[in-house]
Amino acid sequence: MKNINPTKTKSWKSLKKHFLNINTTHILDLFKQNKYRFLSFSTIFNNEILLDYSKNLITEETINKLIDLAKECDLPGAIKSMFQGAKINRSENRAVLHTALRNRKNIPILVDGHDIMPNINTVLEKMKIFCQNIIQGYWKGYTNKNITDIVNIGIGGSNLGPHMVTEALTPYKNHLNIHFVSNIDGTHLFEVLKKINPETTLFLITSKTFTTQETMTNAFSARNWFVQKITKSSSFNHYEQHISKHFIALSANPVEVKKFGINPSTNMFEFWEWVGGRYSLWSSVGLSIMLSLGSNHFESLLDGAYAMDMHFKNTPLNKNIPVILALIGIWYNNFFLSETEAIFPYDQYMHRFAAYIQQSNMESNGKCVDRNGYPINYQTGPIVWGESGTNGQHSFFQLIHQGTKMIPCDFIAPVLSHHPIFDHHDKLIANFLAQTKALAFGKKLEEITQEYITKKQSYIYDLNILPFKVFKGNNPSNSILIKKITPYTLGALIALYEHKIFTQGVIFNIYTFDQWGVELGKQLADDIYSILKQTNINPQYDSSTNGLINYYKYWSQA
């Protein structure tokens, strides 16, 4: 990829001038100027997903200038490099090929001169056979009972993706109970262990390196719990054989897997260094998804993602959904300086989607050094957050409607509900539509005054409160309407956001696929842990950290 500072491009300077012209425009005026604005600013993917981006502070000129920026930053070349397996993650000297995991046409993809597709296909087939054996009851626990519970132990991408997908696709799940443990807080593991039977539980230890502190702490504790349980009812001499029936590793490090006590040749499902953790649900990390849904639905998830991959790779930029969303995000982040964006899925099964995209985006593009190693003097990744509708409406929408901050929003909703109870879904969608309309157009003082006069309410009294009922509007949003949340459409939606994040990273001139910012905290935690365990050593840090350590030691011994 080319290293181009976006602020030095002609298109960036042109956008700055354009911003001065559009900054005082109201979305309401844009709709008045073009009664066909919806048609001009919407696009459909595979007759399954509709993107309406008309309720944004943009014109055709805005989009054209943003596309010029993408071209000047060589986005087309970057897309090509990623799909071809070039080592675009130069800070770690790695290719970025989560797209290869859903390469449904099986087109050869070379890394260091070797086609990686045979290995991908081998692992996928191994996953399918294994899941079939678990689901159909052929794989037995150490007391010859069927597996009933799956516990996925992992953190970050090894947890958020699989957890989100299994929740989002709950209507498609089978009889297996899926549990997720991520937090190193022992309470998380404790509460899961209370619910399960060691005779019928399968643990998935999910870690690329098999050295992640949180994951391995939980994994060792789970193994110890399991061994303690089986020694009460079985010969301790056979515990390694029993572990082989109840512990599976999902990792790229067979050496550490073996040290833990899992046989890599039989009980490990491999994934590779060119798979980033937050983009890994498509790999063996998604084993919990396949166990929950079955292999057919897992492959439908891959199919949907592949379809979006092809859309992203082949569609012109002005009709390319991930590119459009990415460019609009840059428009607000870097010119309006909005700093944040919110995601609101109006589907309760999708309640973990915002948290998943939060990690994908903020860990990817939360960078302050460009690809040349120089400090950045412009905004990069936004703060991403959200909540499922309509819960958010009764929580923080007040600030979005009448606060002082611009918060661009993505509203996501299915047309068809999996559970159409009475008129619930129509009311849900009515709220979805009402919020996007209210945010964009607001409500003027004159309208509110006229309403009070028409209703013959106490006008003299109400004059005092009318200003508090004014909605300024002009709050931008995208509406993503999905025909139905299925494995296919969810796969496409996830890939859409992945490619949006990639596009923004290219234009920001940063390395999207590393996460060095996570490392310092890990190193310090290891140092501090050793001090916490030794009562006779005084900490030698700053006064704040020293004081907190001393109080922790004092209170923990009380």
Curated annotation (Swiss-Prot):
**Enzyme Commission code:** 5.3.1.9
Q: Which UniProt keywords apply?
A: Cytoplasm, Gluconeogenesis, Glycolysis, Isomerase
PROSITE patterns reported in the protein's UniProt record: P_GLUCOSE_ISOMERASE_1 (PS00765), P_GLUCOSE_ISOMERASE_2 (PS00174), P_GLUCOSE_ISOMERASE_3 (PS51463)
- Keyword Isomerase tagged: yes
Any GO molecular function: carbohydrate derivative binding
Q: Where in the cell is it found?
A: Cytoplasm
* Enzyme type, top EC level: isomerase
Give one GO biological process term.
glycolytic process
The entry assigns this protein to a family as follows: Belongs to the GPI family.
Protein name as it appears in the record: Glucose-6-phosphate isomerase
Q: What does this protein do?
A: Catalyzes the reversible isomerization of glucose-6-phosphate to fructose-6-phosphate.
Which cellular component terms (GO) are annotated to the entry?
Answer: cytosol
Pathway it acts in? Carbohydrate biosynthesis; gluconeogenesis; Carbohydrate degradation; glycolysis; D-glyceraldehyde 3-phosphate and glycerone phosphate from D-glucose: step 2/4
Catalytic activity as recorded in UniProt = alpha-D-glucose 6-phosphate = beta-D-fructose 6-phosphate
Chief localisation class: cytoplasm
Write out the catalytic residues in the record. 363 (proton donor), 394, 522
One Pfam family this sequence matches: PGI
